[in-house]
Amino acid sequence: MNAIRYPFITEKAMMLMDENKLQFVVDTRANKTQVENDVVKMYGFTVKSVCTMTTMKGLKKALVTFNETDAAHEIATRIGLV
């Protein structure tokens, strides 16, 4: 099961990139370990922490913090967000 569905792009999420964090919408059945493993497998950067939250609309979001400096900007550039 691929836990990550798509990146969550808002103005607040873009500001979090300066703190080396990215937000993703994930499968509602996915746990933090699955999200971490998928991020490492897809993008090749080590993950410092994963925080998950469920919105009132029923979406599950994951806030991923990276160990490497500027990893969030590098991933955002690869995806085409920046």
Swiss-Prot record:
Keywords: Ribonucleoprotein, Ribosomal protein, RNA-binding, rRNA-binding. GO terms for molecular function: rRNA binding; structural constituent of ribosome. GO terms for biological process: translation. GO terms for cellular component: ribonucleoprotein complex; ribosome. InterPro entries: Nucleotide-bd_a/b_plait_sf, Ribosomal_uL23-like, Ribosomal_uL23/eL15/eS24_sf. Belongs to the universal ribosomal protein uL23 family. Part of the 50S ribosomal subunit. Contacts protein L29. Binds to 23S rRNA. One of the proteins that surrounds the polypeptide exit tunnel on the outside of the ribosome. NCBIfam families: PRK14548.1. PANTHER family: 60S RIBOSOMAL PROTEIN L23A (PTHR11620). This is Large ribosomal subunit protein uL23. It comes from Methanococcoides burtonii (strain DSM 6242 / NBRC 107633 / OCM 468 / ACE-M). The gene is rpl23.
